[in-house]
Structures are given as C-alpha cells and as structure tokens.
C-alpha cells in the first residue's frame, strides 16, 4: 500500500493516453487530491513568485484559498475539462509540448498527460506542487515558437493588461499551434460588484474580456477556430475560445 502511495506522488507518474471516460478522469482527481494532502499539508510545501508585476491582481485572494481552513473538494469539473475538449477539436494538434497557465491543484497537468502530451510545462504565481513553476504570464521566460499548445484556464480575468498576457502567449506559441483561453462570462451586474469587492482592480463592464470581438483584437493575426459560449447561466457562464497560429 505504501509503495502504491509513493508511486502516485512521484513527479514522473504518468497515465495511459486512452483514459477518456468520466470514471477514469475521476481517477485523476483522486491522484491530485492525495498529492495536495501530501505536498501542502504534510510537507508544508508552498512557493510564491516574488517579481509579480502590477498587471496581475487577485493573488492574495487566490492564495487565501489555501489558508482559510478549507480542503478542496476533488471531483470532475467541466471548468477544468472543457478547455482541453476544445483543444482536442483540432485533429492535427501536435502533442509534444504544452504550457498550462494557472493549474492550481495540478488537475490540468495530469489531464494533459492523459490525452497524450509528452512535455508539460505549468506556470502559476504560487503553488505547492513540484510540477508547477512560479512566474508571471505577462513575462513568460520561454523562447519564441516553443509550445504546440497553451491552455489559459480562468486566469486572464486576473490581469489588468490582458493584451500583454496574450502577446506573450502568441509569442511562445509555435506555428500551427493552438491556444485555448477560458473565462467566466458575467451576465449579472451584481456578480461583478461582488467580484470587485473581493478582488481589487478586476476589470468590469465593457473592459471585462468575455466576447469574441475582444479576443479577436487580443489575438490579432491568429485564426479563431473554436468558440464555446454557454449562455445558460443567469449569473455567469463559461466562455472558451481557441486560436491557431498559422
């Protein structure tokens, strides 16, 4: 039993690439939950990027989730899965190197491995995970034309300069590579007011990035290949968009 547990915690632990059923994706969540308990609660592992620019907001708000006494509930979540399903809509997608921005609990890392990516880079402003580098999405320390795919899930809203962040994503993306961005589309003003109270400086109103026209300007020169706009939510709903660098 101890041997199995140690294997699950191993940084090089990999999943077979044919795991696409809901039950097998749930297995990923279980692994990440065990790793969180081990690295954060047992080993007290936590690192923080000190050189964050003023463009990034909500760091203290997000970091608080690790220290407010709540242990995260792990279950398959469409917020995590949908960006990858949009990415996989490209039948010619190369699966050599992928960059994941904002993988708080490692789920995206293991999903990327499960769907076949060979080299996975993960970046966040803070993390307990040895699989995640700390850094700033406005200043990516990677060479140009480096990644076959980029997943930016639910992090762009924490930027006061989304153009700079998107420019960096475009710069490090390879030709024929794809970048997927997921944001929360807010349709109720009261929800925006609540967010602005919790997160100082978050963009609201027409400045909030949540439409195709806005993203087309941010990723000028790239081709929009997929849009998922779930308009069912009365308060907010997922908006996921994919661009390809031709």
Short names for language-model regions:
Residues 23, 27-91:
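Class I SAM-dependent methyltransferase Rossmann-like catalytic core
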Residues 93, 160, 174, 220:
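Short conserved AdoMet
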Residues 97-139:
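Class I SAM-dependent methyltransferase SAM/SAH-binding core
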Residues 138-150:
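A short acidic, Gly/Pro-enriched loop at the edge of an enzyme's catalytic core
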Residues 149-161:
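A short SAM/SAH-binding and catalytic strip from SAM-dependent methyltransferases
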Residues 163-178:
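A short glycine-rich, Lys/Arg-flanked "PGG" loop and its adjoining helix->strand segment in the class I
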Residues 180-216:
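Conserved class I S-adenosyl-L-methionine
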Residues 220-246:
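Core SAM-dependent methyltransferase catalytic element
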């Amino acid at each position: 039993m101890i041997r199995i547990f140690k294997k699950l915690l191993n940084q090089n632990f990999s999943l077979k690439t044919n795991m696409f059923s809901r039950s097998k994706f749930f297995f990923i969540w279980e692994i990440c939950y065990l790793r969180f308990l081990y690295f954060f609660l047992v080993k007290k592992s936590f690192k923080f990027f000190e050189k964050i620019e003023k463009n990034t907001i909500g760091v203290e708000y997000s970091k608080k989730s690790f220290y407010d006494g709540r242990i995260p509930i792990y279950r398959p979540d469409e917020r995590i899965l949908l960006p990858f399903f949009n990415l996989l809509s490209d039948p010619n997608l190369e699966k050599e190197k992928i960059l994941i921005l904002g993988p708080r609990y490692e789920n995206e890392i293991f999903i990327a491995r499960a769907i076949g990516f060979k080299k996975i880079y993960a970046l966040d402003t803070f993390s307990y995970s040895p699989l995640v580098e700390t850094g700033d999405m406005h200043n990516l320390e990677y060479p140009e034309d480096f990644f076959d795919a980029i997943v930016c899930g639910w992090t762009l809203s924490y930027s006061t300069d989304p153009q700079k962040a998107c420019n960096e994503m475009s710069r490090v993306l390879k030709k024929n590579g794809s970048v997927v961005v997921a944001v929360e589309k807010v349709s109720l003003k009261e929800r925006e007011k609540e967010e602005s109270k919790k997160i100082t400086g978050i963009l609201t109103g027409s400045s909030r990035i949540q439409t195709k026209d806005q993203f087309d300007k941010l990723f000028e020169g790239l081709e929009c290949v997929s849009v998922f706009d779930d308009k069912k939510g009365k308060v907010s709903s997922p908006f996921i968009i994919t661009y390809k660098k031709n």
